[in-house]
Amino acid sequence: MRVKRYLVFWLVSALLVGPCLARGGETGGEEAFVQALEEDGFIVQKGRLGYLDLIKLHEAGLVPSAYGNNPATKYLAFFVPPAPGHTVDDQISQVQRPPGVSGNVSAFWNLRPDEAVVFVGRTPPECRYFCFDHIIMSRAYGNETRWLFANIADALNNLVIRTEGTPNGTPGNPYNQTTVIVATADRGIDQRIRAAARSAGYSDDAMNTQVFPASILNLGLENDSDTFAIHLRPALFTDQQAGDNYIDNTPATVLRVTPENATQLDPYGYPKLRVRGTGMTELDLTDDLEDLRNAILTRYSGLKARELPASAGFPAGIDAIQRGIDAVGPTNDAAYLWSANQTISSATPPFFNTSQYYGFLRDPAVTLGNDTDEFIIVYGVNHVATGKATYSSFAVYGADVWNGVGSITDLDFNGTAEEYLPDNPDAKYLYVYKIARNCDGDPRCFEVPYGAGGHGIDLDQPLLILWRIYLENATKTGPSYEEIVYDRAIKFDPASQG
């Protein structure tokens, strides 16, 4: 089986261990839109939205790792039919048949230069953040296929998306609003699809284009063409039940739109990027953070302390694309830090075993035993309080299989540093949180679960901490690494431990 088929097989297999795919309702507007597209000479195929439980997939033995799942939220993927005249591999169809899922969709797909993938429906209900991110998943380098998992350009997030509640991207209410997103490489195709949407009653003020720039992509349907994905990332729903309902039964439809006849190509150029940074930094809080560090070390002075490193975790998507390395699925809307001394920079095959790469994450290993005097203190600047983020979090992972077992968000940070710095007015901009095996009722502590499966981290399993810092309001993109103070962590052990 070719590598391309291998990729699709694993992603669709995930549906057997996760919830089923969601599909939007057949509204009159959607049907009129499809009819208008067909009348304009397009072949229209309906896809779906769905999410994959990477932990369950790993526990089922279908993939060797969990690939840095975000335990704070569930990401939806666009499941797209193959181009006309193409099919998903027969083996995949057989695998999907038992749960009754159509075998003719895939979360990984190719795209012709004259095609489009279209989202029509509603945005997520109110949440702290959401975005639609277009991604190059894999690329052929001669006889070698590499896993890139790299965002192509800026995401379409809740601060910039055009919806009925935010016409032309103006400020308003972007949640639970009708929108149309045309993901394409071609200007002419985009214009024709927009015209069809207008004829079906959709407002041009609620239409968006997600550009697949031909200048940096290998578009087409050949075995050496790039493989793509689009992910919808919602985070921290105001009403969790409404959020769960959206994930399970997304009120939207995904369409693959292909012209019946050859068309004169008019490719888009690479889109203009939003620029990180405002010139205002968190760096004046460095002294306060050092005071907090000293207060933590003083409180636990009877224990052995080991300060963990912190560095940027992942390369930017465009950096990974140019270097042919794995980017681990970043978005331009975030900054990523982790408890390691370097950023990853390895070329990897598809669905690689993470325990065979990135040895610096496990050497020297950080483990967490069950002694009451063994724990980790995570502390730093609350980036939401300083205005550098819309939301931020840290998550605990197994450092070998990258299984995220829990996440703490900035909602839990408020008021946690004052007890360490009671007379410091800047303590409100800082946080302290504990990671342990037994929190003994401490409300400011995360209890790391045991277990050899993906839902737990064994006593002797190395772990790491990953910080996510999302979306600065002033720039409508991720914060600049140069303007944030890096988060920190200290591992404490019994003084008698060797």
Regions found by a protein language model. Name each.
Residues M1-V8:
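Bacterial N-terminal signal peptides that target proteins for export
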Residues R23-G498:
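A compositional/structural signature for long, glycine/proline-rich flexible linkers
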Residues L11, L15-P19:
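Hydrophobic core
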